[in-house]
């Protein structure tokens, strides 16, 4: 364990270039190291949970080893224990491990009894996931009947997380037609089982045979496929790892390419094993010839937060009022962002370093004010970043080890010697957050964040964008309880002329309101009167404290701010004003609405697009239909505004999961870009009753035991728009960090961006053998603008359509004019050039083309099956018995002929026709 902990920094340096990942996982030989499993602070203390986690991983490792043909196993795992749990000698202090970079989170179910394991996946096929979520009851083995053994489920979720594969089942469509037969959505197709219909009432279920609809040929929606307990087939883990004999992923030879599941839709019909083979992990390993060792574990307990500000006061900080803006942002951090109980120190540097404050524990406003008074007020000299860092290490070591401490480093200058202290940075184990101010900040600055797992941000000299305050506002601790974290409600700025006003509204919702702070920055002074704020009760609020030296005014709302709309009006002339509003959680039982944002990579090379993601949740519940806007600002000062969408199209991987996404293609220069998002929730903004388990192990509806089908209760239908009756109204802003662009050509920038891939193509039969297609329109440049035309092709062979798209039959699309990106497209056509008769399986794909003839990737492949229902049997008139013969009372059974038997036979024949159609 010791050698792993000491080598953690070296491992972090080998993260994939450009990947925006907080994870510390590394593949060392064939073993995964640096896995962090965090117990959420809301989980009640229970030491057994730690042993349960160990048992789960220990059982998962050999299963992973076998499933990957002796390539991978779990080597060591860090278990992150909440600060509120009782300390023990075996619990050590974390180094770089935090809740932010945890790979697995064990948290309470929300809502109760919703113990489904799942993995949050923002990206597309082959892209790593974000986190795995388990509940304490699941880890304890109390949900084996519902999901299977914990170790096997962990491997299923690990494949989502590490290799970006998807599920091979489909809760929304469990059967499909192929060659006139109903087929279950399974992988591999060789899995044997029974198709049955459970009819449940109360706690008991009756099993009945599935029946096909006479019009569609499909089984009832409630039908289930129950696998046989004994199978000869060994795949697939992404379908049902709960089957005892399933020990492999689906491979190309046994992959069910026709099954309508996420793996086929998102991965272009490739098997999970093919995707895994394309991963960097697979490419740099060879199978082991010996059995792997059992995993080892380190127990880490979160301690007090220790932060040292390292602030540039060199001569260049006088440019554009940078030092004044530093004071304003630093004051926000010290007065509001940093949590009560944290230890904070401060170092300023130019060509040398100066200790402005030793570590001070924040217990009251007095410590906050004293630290704020220590902020540097004069700028001169050169820039020596290493001097500032070394001084910060010394300040921290006077009271605590540097492991797990944090340094906030702000600089605006170049420093060619910054790499000289990289070895000391690795050795000291502090997490370094970097703030690059202006266009000339040291180019190596981001390396410090990347090697230590810190946040990297960039603030331009455009004061009205409020970038510096946003950067400091993003530095709330992710390791503290949710009630202590600062939440930013508003961040606005405007340059006013001729006594103009800046007016607006801030929503204080019921999940926040504690420690609410309104902060205004200015360049000179306010015109009379002082800023006006109208509180929801209708009264005005003008009790602002005005700082003369750092040009700011602020108002701390006493107690809990009143829920409602807070209106503001600020007046000035020929100067820039900014407004920042932050608050904290108001209720111990009601989770706050939180907004987090990130880019898919921290470096972008033209013409590769970037993707901006924003996650909006209340606890673990996703917030839907919010209005989310991203502002992306380059070093040139150009700002691009993007509307982010949760529509399951373009850059957005999954619809209605509370993750809003959009491609960014509007490069205008090389260098740094900052990212900021606004999120607004109004009367049409609901939340789900439960998180969508899109990438989770399959819920076991039933199983066969001693020849009899046993049933679990129906799983709550949480993937539907099952929404709370209470709407969610809120306003939030958040920093998405920064990224660095390269290879951007000089203006005019050529059009090298094709339309994005269509990922939600759906097809159905309409009327007289017509096919109805729907999809979300791509754009001219990925998901922006309007495509020029569509190419639609069809085939009766799914692989021919995928691999020989240009040779497949083309549909006439003369009358199909593309709509604006993200609009719904509908197109109806009659197949020509291919016989379309009863039982025909037809596969359809679409390709978008832009005005410069750049083509998108081929869409997901949609399928329709032409099913002509059999003619209904003619009604047989009842026989009239001869009047002279009495009609005896009879029981209907298989030995007595007559009208009853005839009706039964007709019914049976009809069912037989449907079952073999």
UniProtKB/Swiss-Prot annotation:
It comes from the Eukaryota. The record marks 696-697 as: Cleavage. Transmembrane segments: none annotated. Residues 46-199 are annotated as: Metalloprotease domain. One of its GO terms (molecular function) is metal ion binding. GO terms for cellular component: extracellular region; plasma membrane. Its main location: secreted. It is an enzyme of class 3 (hydrolase). Residues 306-475 form the VWFA domain. Zn(2+) binds at residues 156, 160, 167. Its EC number is 3.4.-.-. The metalloprotease region is responsible for autoproteolytic processing. It can also cross-cleave other CLCA substrates. May be involved in mediating calcium-activated chloride conductance. May play critical roles in goblet cell metaplasia, mucus hypersecretion, cystic fibrosis and AHR. May be involved in the regulation of mucus production and/or secretion by goblet cells. Involved in the regulation of tissue inflammation in the innate immune response. May play a role as a tumor suppressor. Induces MUC5AC. Induces a cAMP-dependent chloride conductance possibly through effects on CFTR in colon carcinoma cells. Belongs to the CLCR family. This is Calcium-activated chloride channel regulator 1. It comes from Sus scrofa. The gene is CLCA1.
């Amino acid at each position: 364990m010791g050698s792993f902990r000491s080598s953690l920094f070296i491992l972090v340096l080998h993260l994939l270039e450009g990947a925006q990942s907080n994870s510390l996982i590394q593949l060392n030989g064939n073993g995964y190291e640096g896995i962090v499993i965090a117990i959420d602070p809301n989980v009640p203390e229970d030491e057994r949970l730690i042993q349960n986690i160990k048992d789960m991983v220990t059982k998962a490792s050999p299963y992973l080893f076998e499933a990957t043909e002796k390539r991978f196993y779990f080597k060591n795992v860090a278990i992150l224990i909440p600060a509120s749990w009782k300390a023990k000698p075996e619990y050590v202090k974390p180094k770089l491990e935090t809740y932010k970079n945890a790979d697995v989170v064990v948290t309470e179910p929300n809502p109760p009894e919703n113990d489904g394991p799942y993995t949050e996946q923002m990206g597309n096929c082959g892209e790593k996931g974000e986190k795995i979520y388990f509940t304490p009851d699941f880890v304890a083995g109390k949900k084996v009947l519902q999901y299977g053994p914990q170790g096997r489920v962990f491997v299923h979720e690990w494949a989502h997380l590490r290799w970006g594969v998807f599920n091979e089942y489909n809760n929304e469509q469990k059967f499909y037609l192929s060659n006139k037969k109903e087929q279950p959505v399974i992988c591999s197709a060789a899995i044997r089982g029974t198709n049955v219909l459970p009819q449940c009432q109360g706690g008991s279920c009756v099993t009945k045979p599935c029946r096909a609809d006479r019009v569609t040929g499909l089984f009832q929606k409630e039908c289930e496929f129950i696998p046989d307990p004994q199978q000869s087939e060994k795949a697939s883990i992404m379908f049902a790892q709960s089957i005892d004999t399933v020990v492999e992923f689906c491979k190309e030879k046994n992959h069910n390419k026709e099954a309508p599941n996420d793996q086929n839709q998102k991965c272009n019909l490739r098997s999970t094993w093919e995707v895994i083979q394309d991963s960097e992990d697979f490419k740099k390993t060879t199978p082991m010839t010996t059995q792997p060792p059992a995993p080892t574990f380190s127990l880490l307990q979160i301690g007090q937060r220790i932060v040292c500000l390292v602030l540039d006061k060199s001569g260049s900080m006088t440019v554009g009022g940078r030092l004044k803006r530093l004071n304003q942002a630093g004051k926000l951090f010290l007065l509001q962002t940093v949590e009560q109980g944290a230890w904070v120190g401060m170092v300023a540097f130019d060509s040398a370093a100066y200790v402005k404050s030793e570590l001070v524990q924040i217990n009251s406003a007095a410590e906050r004010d004293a630290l704020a008074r220590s902020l540097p007020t004069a700028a001169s000299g050169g820039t020596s970043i290493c001097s500032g860092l070394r001084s910060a290490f010394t300040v921290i070591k006077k009271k605590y080890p540097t492991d797990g401490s944090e340094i906030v480093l702000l600089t605006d200058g170049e420093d060619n010697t910054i790499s000289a202290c990289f070895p000391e940075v690795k050795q000291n184990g502090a997490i370094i957050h970097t703030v690059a101010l202006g266009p000339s900040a040291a180019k190596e600055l981001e390396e410090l964040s990347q090697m230590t797992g810190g946040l990297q941000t960039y603030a331009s000299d455009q004061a009205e964008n409020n970038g510096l305050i946003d950067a400091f506002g993003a530095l709330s601790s992710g390791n503290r309880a949710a009630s202590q974290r600062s939440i930013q409600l508003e961040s606005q700025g405007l340059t006013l002329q001729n006594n103009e006003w800046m007016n607006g509204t801030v929503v204080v919702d019921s999940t926040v309101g504690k420690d609410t702070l309104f902060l205004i920055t200015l360049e000179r002074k306010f015109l009379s009167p002082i800023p006006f704020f109208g509180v929801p009760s209708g009264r005005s609020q003008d009790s602002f404290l005005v700082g003369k030296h750092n040009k700011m005014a602020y108002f701390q709302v006493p107690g809990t701010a009143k829920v409602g709309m807070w209106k503001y009006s600020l007046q000035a002339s020929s100067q820039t004003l900014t407004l920042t509003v932050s608050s904290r959680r108001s209720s111990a039982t009601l989770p706050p609405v939180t907004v987090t944002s990130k880019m898919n990579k921290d470096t972008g090379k033209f013409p590769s697009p970037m993707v901006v993601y924003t996650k909006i949740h209340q606890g673990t519940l996703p917030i839907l239909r919010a209005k989310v806007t991203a502002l992306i600002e380059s070093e040139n000062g150009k700002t691009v505004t993007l509307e982010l969408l949760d529509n399951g199209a373009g850059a957005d991987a999954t619809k209605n999961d509370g993750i809003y996404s959009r491609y960014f293609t509007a490069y205008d220069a090389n260098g740094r870009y900052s990212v900021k998002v606004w999120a607004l929730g109004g009367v049409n903004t609901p939340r789900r009753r439960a998180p969508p388990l899109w990438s989770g192990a399959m819920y076991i509806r039933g199983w066969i035991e001693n020849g009899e089908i046993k049933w679990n209760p129906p799983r709550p239908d949480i993937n539907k728009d099952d929404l709370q009756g209470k709407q969610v109204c809120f306003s939030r802003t958040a920093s998405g960090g920064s990224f660095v662009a390269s290879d951007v050509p000089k203006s005019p920038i050529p059009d090298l961006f094709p339309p994005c891939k269509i990922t939600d193509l759906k097809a159905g039969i309409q009327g007289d053998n017509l096919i109805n297609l729907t999809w979300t329109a791509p754009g001219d440049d990925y998901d922006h603008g309007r495509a020029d035309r569509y190419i639609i092709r069809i085939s009766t062979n799914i692989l021919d359509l995928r691999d020989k798209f240009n040779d497949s039959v083309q549909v006439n699309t003369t009358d199909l004019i593309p709509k604006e990106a993200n609009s719904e497209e509908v197109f109806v056509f009659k197949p020509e050039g291919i016989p379309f008769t009863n039982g025909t399986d037809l596969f359809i794909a679409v390709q978008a083309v832009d005005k410069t003839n750049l083509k998108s990737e081929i869409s997901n492949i949609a399928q329709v099956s032409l099913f002509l229902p059999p003619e209904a049997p003619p009604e047989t008139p009842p026989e009239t018995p001869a009047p002279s013969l009495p009609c005896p009372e009879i029981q209907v059974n298989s030995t007595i002929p007559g009208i009853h038997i005839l009706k039964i036979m007709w019914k049976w024949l009809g069912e037989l026709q449907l079952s073999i159609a």
